[in-house]
Amino acid sequence: MSKGPGPGGSAASSAPPAATAQVLQAQPEKPQHYTYLKEFRTEQCPLFVQHKCTQHRPYTCFHWHFVNQRRRRSIRRRDGTFNYSPDVYCTKYDEATGLCPEGDECPFLHRTTGDTERRYHLRYYKTGICIHETDSKGNCTKNGLHCAFAHGPHDLRSPVYDIRELQAMEALQNGQTTVEGSIEGQSAGAASHAMIEKILSEEPRWQETAYVLGNYKTEPCKKPPRLCRQGYACPYYHNSKDRRRSPRKHKYRSSPCPNVKHGDEWGDPGKCENGDACQYCHTRTEQQFHPEIYKSTKCNDMQQSGSCPRGPFCAFAHVEQPPLSDDLQPSSAVSSPTQPGPVLYMPSAAGDSVPVSPSSPHAPDLSALLCRNSSLGSPSNLCGSPPGSIRKPPNLEGIVFPGESGLAPGSYKKAPGFEREDQVGAEYLKNFKCQAKLKPHSLEPRSQEQPLLQPKQDMLGILPAGSPLTSSISSSITSSLAATPPSPVGTSSVPGMNANALPFYPTSDTVESVIESALDDLDLNEFGVAALEKTFDNSTVPHPGSITIGGSLLQSSAPVNIPGSLGSSASFHSASPSPPVSLSSHFLQQPQGHLSQSENTFLGTSASHGSLGLNGMNSSIWEHFASGSFSPGTSPAFLSGPGAAELARLRQELDEANSTIKQWEESWKQAKQACDAWKKEAEEAGERASAAGAECELAREQRDALEVQVKKLQEELERLHAGPEPQALPAFSDLEALSLSTLYSLQKQLRAHLEQVDKAVFHMQSVKCLKCQEQKRAVLPCQHAALCELCAEGSECPICQPGRAHTLQS
């Protein structure tokens, strides 16, 4: 007994033996395939009739909702033929109403919604490999749960052939063997590869990655509508949802357009008012083949089965991409024609990012570029692409389309707030670790102790001014230096940043918990703190040309990383919005009287006189700042030499960044207010619409009641006209328009009615009072019944006095 929906029976007597054997052979079907072949869209949805189906918009229901969505079950009869053709469409079928004059017995294919009769036919269902990937649930990202194409070899099924097709195949093969295997077993995979091979033979450039990235789905298909048999493997688009804007002509980000994509569903690109000028993706094809995303993820089919049916049209990587090296040496960064090198994104004057090769003569020093970018508050990730973008493989970094400018494909101005506070700490740490690996430590001769200080100095050099990590690590270094004895450290340049400078983000907008977690990830061993404190145990005479800060030596040109709070000499108060990292905070809490004599001598003062300044520094050093010559926001540094201009420039850029952030905040507030106002208007409009609907329903009910009443009155009027009762006479001016027979009939009717009236008048006169004509007559003393009792009291009998009676009657 066959498990498939098409029962196999005895073939026609004229069929060849081989074809008869294949028809008689049962086609086993998997349970999932059997369910779809037998029941998909063949019955009406019972929930939709009750208006309870939740899969109507978008329409993903297993059953049909409207008649034009109904699918006839495909059956192979006992004679080996199908109940309707899998290829020839019916010309009488109405796609709007879903009706055909032949009904279900029509031998041709009906073009239902989604072309379900052909896709789910025994001949084609799950016989071809789908070129789209699957999501986390195993469903097709393009066609959803009910995809009619196979996702993997385990989902393939062999097609069921019509006996006439089998006879034609056998006649074509002329008795060759192994026909069944080539038809039944290899048809699905071979058909997919054959279609791609045909396309590649027509246009060999489709094998080039750059050509696919620049031209795939950018031109309309040259074949007539509904005649393209290449399916989704066709490199040309067939509708607006399949179209991809050419990256040569249009610049757009890899993010989906909010006007087109809602949730997981891609809508009509025509809903976007900006059209092709929109800076976001409009279709899934545009997003997958965007230069920032293209080939950035491994292909699932290649990982699972080792082959991909999409071939060169696959948007995912088929070859294992080598990871970027941790140590980017100049020799490895040289670009070659075969394999372009990685691209660094330099900020240009226009605010965009320009790709520059590390080996280019215009490429700046990595550490200088990193420090510059970090000081602006927007750290650039040297280990990959800029923040917020997906890292591309090395072989796609340098792709530039013909006729394009030098701008990188993803070089767009970032939207306000693209760097959230919870990402700043992690980006700083990542940049620091990259810088620690990239920075050569053997560029100049150093003393034995100098490399121990360098990691923390480098950390301060790559962090932006006033950032949470800058103030925290600066306070950490200062606390460590203040709590240890002097050491013979040689003169070195400490690129410490100003801790009193305002942070790039306002204090109220900084998420302290995120910075705390970022600081917890810091490996203090990378800074050489243990070796640094060990080195400080060796006490020697300090260098005469340096400044003594709590037992350490700093060059006079370097800023002092201490906040401007000069009132306290026993503790360190950080101006950073995040909690400072203090390595030796317990030393700062010790009273000044516990300092040893050697320390007092080294500091050049006596603890008993209370002349020690902040953190044990000689108070004479702070005389320049205690006089109030500097504002509270000015850092306690020596503003002289070439560093003053650089500091002024950094402050100016910081002010510009702060003003830009304020403008973004104002714009965001205005947009939020406008959105709130629109939302309120929409709610009010909805309420008014509901009220109008209720009023309309009430008016409709009143109208129906009035119509019923009018109908009743019309029926009553017709009944009166048809009965024997007297009718209202028409206008006298209309009598001449009536026919003579009508006038005779009217005259006869009126005479009959007049006789009835006379009889009624005579009867009423015989029983009513002759005087008042209202009360009934009563018997008078004269035995006459002419007057009522009331009239008889004041009047005499009119019968006894005829003259009186005549007067009464007159």
From Swiss-Prot:
Polar residues bias locations: 328-338
Biased composition (Low complexity): 10-19
Region (Disordered): 1-24, 239-265, 324-343
GO CC aspect terms: cytoplasm
Gene from which the chain derives: UNK
Zinc finger residue ranges, RING-type: 766-801
GO molecular function (one): zinc ion binding
Zinc finger (C3H1-type): 84-113, 124-154, 215-241, 251-285, 293-321
Name used for this protein in its record: RING finger protein unkempt homolog
Functional summary from the UniProt entry: Sequence-specific RNA-binding protein which plays an important role in the establishment and maintenance of the early morphology of cortical neurons during embryonic development. Acts as a translation repressor and controls a translationally regulated cell morphology program to ensure proper structuring of the nervous system. Translational control depends on recognition of its binding element within target mRNAs which consists of a mandatory UAG trimer upstream of a U/A-rich motif. Associated with polysomes.
Residues with the Phosphoserine modification: 240, 374, 378, 385, 631
Any one biological process term the GO annotation gives: cell morphogenesis involved in neuron differentiation
Cell compartments where the protein resides: Cytoplasm
Sequence ranges of Basic residues compositional bias: 241-253
Family label: Belongs to the unkempt family.
Keywords per UniProt: Coiled coil, Cytoplasm, Metal-binding, Phosphoprotein, Repeat, Repressor, RNA-binding, Translation regulation, Zinc, Zinc-finger
CDD domains assigned: RING-HC_UNK
Residues forming coiled coils: 643-723
One Pfam family hit: zf-CCCH_UNK
Superkingdom field: Eukaryota
